Amino acid sequence: MPFFSFTCYFCNTIITAGVSDFFLRKRSADRREYGRQQETSLNVRKLISPGKRSAEHLSKITLLIRFLKPVTWIPVIWSFLCGAVSSGAFGWPDFLGIKFFLGILLTGPLASGTCQMLNDYFDRDLDEINEPWRPIPGGEISLRNATILIAVWSLLSVLVGYLIHPLIALYVIIGIVNAHLYSANPIKLKKRLWAGNIIVALSYLVIPWIAGEIAYSSGFTLQSLFPSLVVAALFTVSSTGTMTINDFKSVEGDRQIGVKTLPVAFGERNAAVIAAVLINIGQLMAAGYLLMLGENLFALIVALLVIPQFYLQFDLVRSPKTMDVRYNAIAQNFLVAGMLVCALAIKSYRL
């Protein structure tokens, strides 16, 4: 949602949470051969998904951090960084600059945090099934306080976006609208199969990437932004597959509430195959585009980075619900590395 709120929907992106012992006990006999993998996956989920606790045991700062869900900020911050690098005007000294600090503040705790809060607010019924430890369904943050926090964070996001560039402030406003379209009834795009994943992926990648480039480009036109638009759009294809992997953790709740994700619509294994194809095609097409730009070495590196992901996808397809956390924890590193390689290629092409 919000510009980088896109992150919002993205809420689920890199790391996923919780599968209960109930679901593990329901595994059929033909899945017992994967018992050790299931146990490992469960342990990982327990580590990253705190149990439901009463508010008296948590400080207000801890509650706020859980509500903002910091783990979801990373992909959006990374997209902003890739956009900055691709501008050709971003160098090592800029890491210490005020503009970069504001960019990280915006794409991380502010815009992405706003998205997370919006998503939690509108998904509170679903979270009672899938993620009961989240602050709202857990009773740790009231709806009134959540509304106040969302309003304050939205205003701060627009303000910081404007300080970076007026156009970025507009992106933030559009992102806030997108967040509502994604999560709120009656539209609730996340219920509409492909629509939810696509809008999240676009917001997740294209908008922050272009915002990063705009932030550091002294002058820009649609033509100058075109290489970044193409690469970011192609990685959006891959990100759509990533969104599908994040859906495996909430299949039961989605099915009960009527959220039509790919795993719900096509089955978990078929959805895993679709996700793998999208992830690979997007990156290979990006490598092909770099070849068109004459950046052959960068294209080769991007293509090689797909190989370990392809290998890990065999385990994912075999057991999507137990291997999703492991896949994201390992394979995503190669995908985001490919994004940075593409950004460096665009910078090289411009220079």
Predicted regions and their residues:
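Multi-pass alpha-helical membrane architecture of UbiA-family
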Residues: F3-R27, R31-L351
